[in-house]
């Protein structure tokens, strides 16, 4: 891959594998099938809409991951907006750990000017009236889901190449939190799996 080509990337805080992740993924998939909306892996965006050469992205993400310890994120209320990428989601409770992680990412990428960080975990992306989103939340008992799970452990940052078309999102690499920030081998990208593989937990 030509690392001089600029692309848009997103860094996600990804839940540890286990029953909670599987239940969240199944919920996203079920809503997707019923309402013909995109499916995607459960995640909390740490920072998005970052452009630059891919190798630089990997080096900076390694630095970020080395400065953040594994953490738990606690679920709050179910919310929805008229924005496509904030259609229906679980609010993540603000803590020093989650705000600190976002601060590290913004500093490394020189994006301190961004609006206040609002951590959340999306369950659906859709263009539909807010009232319909509310009815879907009730239909699937999403507030009960959030309360039952309570919180999830976060053990890695996942880097995705993203665009307005969710179907074209592509997983690039995972970085374990607290890992050593070593130089990235230019040949790291031999695994070309897409985000879709996240469905097979």
Label every model-predicted segment.
Residues 1-74, 95-148, 165-201:
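Basic, often amphipathic N-terminal segments
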Residues 85-87:
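A generic structural signal for beta-strand entry/edge sites
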Residues 72-82:
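A short, structured active-site edge motif that brings together acidic residues
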Residues 155-166:
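Short beta-strand segments and strand-loop junctions that repeat across beta-rich extracellular domains
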């Amino acid at each position: 891959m030509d690392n001089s080509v600029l692309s848009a990337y997103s860094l996600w805080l990804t839940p540890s594998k286990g029953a909670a992740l599987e239940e969240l993924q199944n919920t996203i998939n079920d809503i997707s099938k019923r309402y013909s909306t995109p499916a995607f892996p459960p995640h909390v965006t740490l920072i998005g809409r970052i452009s630059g050469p891919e190798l630089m992205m990997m080096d900076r993400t390694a630095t970020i991951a080395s400065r953040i310890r594994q953490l738990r994120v606690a679920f709050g209320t179910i919310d929805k907006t008229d924005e496509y990428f904030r259609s229906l989601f679980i609010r993540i409770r603000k803590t020093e750990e989650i705000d600190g992680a976002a601060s590290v990412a913004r500093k490394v990428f020189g994006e301190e000017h961004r609006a206040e960080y609002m951590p959340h975990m999306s369950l659906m992306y859709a263009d539909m009236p807010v009232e319909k989103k509310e009815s879907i939340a009730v239909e699937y008992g999403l507030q009960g889901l959030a309360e039952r799970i309570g919180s999830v452990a976060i053990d890695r940052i996942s880097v995705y190449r993203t665009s307005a078309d969710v179907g074209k999102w592509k997983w690039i690499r995972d970085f374990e939190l607290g890992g050593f920030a070593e130089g990235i081998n230019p040949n790291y990208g031999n695994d070309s799996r897409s985000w879709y593989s996240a469905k097979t937990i």
